[in-house]
Amino acid sequence: MHDIPKQIPLANNHISVDCVVIGFDGEQLKVLLINRIGEENGKVYRDMKLPGSLIYMDEDLDEAAQRVLFELTGIRNVNLMQFKAFGSKNRTSNPKDVHWLERAMQSKVERIVTIAYLSMVKIDRALDKNLDEFQACWVCLLYTSPS
């Protein structure tokens, strides 16, 4: 029998989806963000992030993206297209992000591989209808020229 050499431990990966929804309101391009409230070192913080979350064991990636977008923004039935995977080993180096995700998911999170989805939409009343209820909002994209 051959001895199997000791190897670096396998990662305990979590898979998440992030939804990048770009909207046009007739005047400006905007991105859909959600408010995130967290706590770090006993201090409450607020910031904004893309709608995203971990996937469930019984759903595929496309189903997860639609579910996450609906649960976090109330928006459904938009065409989401998978466009990139983010899997850097250092992605979870920001303790604030890891702590927030662990509290939200009630689970220990080590490494996260995120599949990003993109959608382009026309912003209308139907898309704006429930955003306040979900603490989501459209934020103008600012264009800057490279220095």
Q: Which residues are covered by each model-predicted region?
A:
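Active-site cradle of extracellular carbohydrate-active enzymes
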Residues: 140
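Short connector loops at helix/strand junctions that flank enzyme active sites
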Residues: 14, 77, 110-114
